[in-house]
């Protein structure tokens, strides 16, 4: 018999979520996953949620789905600045077996009722994903049954991104020098690229574990774009990370940013698929 409950075995949810084939569901320990699931922070150490709830769907004591939802601890003003005066109702995680659509419906209905429908509700909000999964909050493309259910409930796609992964190997580039700043509370690092002592660009790297890192963003100065400097910076960055023991290096970019897609693919990143975030039509 199917039942929805807030009494659940957290290890069941850990195993269940990792059973979904997603390129950014890295092989993480239960303790690492639990920290991200229950009490997560962003790269600067800010708590992501001020309240967070979980409902699980069991059929004869077997987990067939779960939903995690709540209200964020901050949001983004029109100018992009972070503000603690803004909070979003977010469905952070929603996973259920493909052949158990009724479980997904019950879970989503439970979340929507508790979040309220007067304000816009977000699902798979990119920024508020789990740190152990590179805080890539979007839903991977192979979950068509989840996508379909969200759309049945009035959600529409907000943004789509292309997810990339690369395997690092030893490479040398002596022309570009790196200046790395200290790690943030969220284990991220700002790095400057320099040639002949002059800064030509920069990036932000998130270290997920001893062997895996994630590129948040990268840029080169506008006046040197198209001169091959970006490729040299990436070569230097990969060499720097490889020497630190990193062998997997992932990133993502907007689906309509074809320039960035070309850059990543030119520099050895493999396209893994498309991810999406969602929202309802109600305005905040």
Regions found by a protein language model. Give the residues of each.
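Conserved beta-strand in the GNAT
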Residues: 56, 62-72, 198-207, 214-219
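Conserved acetyl-CoA-binding loop-helix of GNAT-fold acetyltransferases
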Residues: 99-116, 220, 226-239, 243, ...
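Conserved active-site alpha-helix within GNAT-family acetyltransferase domains
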Residues: 128-157, 231, 255-273
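Conserved N-terminal entry element of GNAT/NAT acetyltransferase domains
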Residues: 1-15, 152-159, 167-185
């Amino acid at each position: 018999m199917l039942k929805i409950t807030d009494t659940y075995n957290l290890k069941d949810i850990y195993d269940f979520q990792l059973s979904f084939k997603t390129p950014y569901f890295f092989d993480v320990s239960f303790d690492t996953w639990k920290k991200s699931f229950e009490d997560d922070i962003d790269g600067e150490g800010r708590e992501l949620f001020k309240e967070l709830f979980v409902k699980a769907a069991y059929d004869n004591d077997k987990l067939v789905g779960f939903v995690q939802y709540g209200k964020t601890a901050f949001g983004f003003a029109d100018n992009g600045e972070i503000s603690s005066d803004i909070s979003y109702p977010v469905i952070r995680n929603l996973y259920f077996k493909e052949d158990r659509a009724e479980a997904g419906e019950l879970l989503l209905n439970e979340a929507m009722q508790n979040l309220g429908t007067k304000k816009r509700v977000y699902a798979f909000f990119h920024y508020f994903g789990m740190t152990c999964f590179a805080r890539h909050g979007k839903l991977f493309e192979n979950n068509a049954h989840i996508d379909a259910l969200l759309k049945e409930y009035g959600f529409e796609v907000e943004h789509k991104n292309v997810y990339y992964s690369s395997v690092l190997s030893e490479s040398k580039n002596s022309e570009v020098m790196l200046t790395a700043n200290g790690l943030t509370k969220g284990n991220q690092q700002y790095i400057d690229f320099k040639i002949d002592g002059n800064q030509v660009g920069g990036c932000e790297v998130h270290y997920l574990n001893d062997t895996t890192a994630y590129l948040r963003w990268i840029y080169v100065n506008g006046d040197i774009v198209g001169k091959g400097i970006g490729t040299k910076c990436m070569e230097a960055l990969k060499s720097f990370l490889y020497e630190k023991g990193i062998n997997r290096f992932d990133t993502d970019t907007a689906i309509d940013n074809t320039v960035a897609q070309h850059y990543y693919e030119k520099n050895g990143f493999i396209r893994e698929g498309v991810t999406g975030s969602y929202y309802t039509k109600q305005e905040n």
